[in-house]
Amino acid sequence: MNKILYPKAKITKAQVIEYYIRVAPQILGIVKDRPIVLTRYPNGVDEKGFYEKDRPEGTPPWVKTSTFYSETAKRNVNYILVNDLDTLVWLANLAAIEIHMPLGRVDAREKPDFVLLDLDPEPPANFANAVTVAGLLKEKLDDLGLRAYPKTSGKKGLHVVIPIKREYTYNTTREFAHIIGQYIAKETDLVVSEFSDTKKPNKVFIDYTQNSHGKTMVIPYGLRATPEATVSTPLEWQEVKKELKPESLTLFTVGKRKKDPWKDILENRQKLEVK
């Protein structure tokens, strides 16, 4: 338990476990019944981690799993479901620093309940530029009568997440995200909306491709494998400001936040028949 997982921040495995226990009430409802993908760092984040979809050998029998065919692995995979605190703690004990989830749940894997607008700044564009784009997105989504929830990616970008009714396929949600990105790209030269332009310098790509079967996003309140132990942090819209420093949202600070900006996200599933 005293093993150091974040050398720069001097964070131990015990502290990682304590953090996930603290934020579990905010995490569990959102990740329930989603087949998760892990990135594990048994030797700490300064060493190379490894990606894991399949439940590891020695998985306790009480850990819920879901088995289905993986197109990338070309075989059946036993995916872990983080449906309770014990499973979350067990994963933290495995040094599963990063936990990623799909936008759909196992009972209807092709019917996502979120649309993800992933704002990815290409240097020298930075987080402040992503904030500018997020503001434009909010204005457009407000005009369409859609409520969206922002969070930091835990690295350089922002996620704008729209909760939706489970009535649409990934083809529909991806097309919706693409159209929104194209609209914003016409409003400002800062934005690119086409996958072929993702590496254009000093641009923010509104990544619509994340709305696809098999794609994942880091869970809300999920740790990232950064030197500072940053967290993918749900935000109030009034917090989405250029002055915000994502590197300040860490294991040490996020667990102390008193409000959960995403507390009602599951109660606000919306139709994409926009107003």
Task: Annotate each PLM feature.
Residues 1-18, 28, 32-33, 72-77, ...:
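C-terminal accessory nucleic-acid interaction domains of nucleic acid-metabolism proteins
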Residues 82-109, 131-147:
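Conserved alpha/beta core surface patches that mediate binding of polyanionic ligands
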Residues 161-173:
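Catalytic palm subdomain of template-directed nucleic-acid polymerases
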Residues 1-92:
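Charge-rich, low-complexity segments
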Residues 153-162:
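Short, conserved phosphate-binding/catalytic loop or strand-edge motifs used
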